Amino acid sequence: MEISKITSPEDWEYFAKGAANILFKYTGNNDYLKRKLLRLRLLKQEEEYISTCELYDFIELRCKDLFPNQIIDIQLTVLDSNFTNKLNSQGNKLMLNERYGLLLPNILDGDYRKISLSQKCQLYFNDNDQDINSVIFEIKPKWLYDNYTDNYCRTCSLNQLKKVPRHFCPLDLLYTETIEQGLNDLFAPIPQDIYAKIEKLIPLKKLTTIYFNNPDNVFQKLKQYQKINNKNDLIKNLTSYSDVSQNLSLVMTLRDVGLFIKIEKFDKNNHIHTSHNNIKNVYRINDNKSNGTKDQDQEIGTNDEEDNDEKFLITCNIYDLDLKSKMKYKHWLKVENDLQEIYNSSNPNWRYCIKYDQIHH
């Protein structure tokens, strides 16, 4: 599809940008493009550049098999230089010789308030007429693994290196024994009045506790596919770009993805909520029980004894699947070297990360 044939640059406004991409939000009247974003590549050195076609193939052929229900739908679209040149990129330089862009859904479409909880974590919630129907966490899980030896995990060590204040440790969300602590840390920056307002309408703590205790949750899947099974793929063993295997490029990509975790009130009249893909994403909450439950292969809308339970839908979308260039190996080596003195240091302002042996004797 050639985007210039169905829309003009004036229909798109700057939305956000990352290290490698820039997003534009559609503001025109074409129903097909409503609630969509256009993702284009930012200017990069040629040796580190991954083309949009290569990226599209990587997502469709390598990643979707691993996460069939979590990866945001994308569509390849043809660009022309005239269209790209006329976009208001707010001073950001685009890769003008790139012939393709990606169309993707705008998960944040709607009237959402945003609260920044930390550098890599944002909270969005709709606040229409004092009735909160949905909450979205935007989060980067980063490196997920079983820590056996270090005082600080890789993510917490890097944050200390960068002088980023502590928020939460992603490893805490991997284990039943530490999920509560991880969620307490995750929610701590939310202003108390807003947290209370959300909890009154959407039992955030209870629902996220159920979600992270589910062995199929996205953190567990990311941990599974981030695992290095070949010692040659360990960063410390790299000596040149040719040492970077396809598997390591995939692993490093998965260590830098972003997630949208959306929690919303279940609506039996919403065809998306009742779709086959979402049947297993419905969670029941009963105020008379200490914990909620996850619907297990149950048809939505049946008149059973639990019909009075309040139902919620939890969906997770993975975005930012940017295939990592082999040329980044020097950067990876440098960072790993810089972290060596932090892994087993002691910071009075930073609690030690959980070690696997502490909970699995």
Curated annotation (Swiss-Prot):
It is found in: Nucleus. One of its GO terms (cellular component) is nucleus. Residues 285-304 are annotated as: Disordered. A motif (EXKPK motif) lies at residues 138-142. One of its GO terms (molecular function) is ATP binding. InterPro entries: Ins_P5_2-kin, IP5_2-K_N_lobe. Its main location: nucleus. It catalyses: 1D-myo-inositol 1,3,4,5,6-pentakisphosphate + ATP = 1D-myo-inositol hexakisphosphate + ADP + H(+). Belongs to the IPK1 type 1 family. This is Inositol-pentakisphosphate 2-kinase.
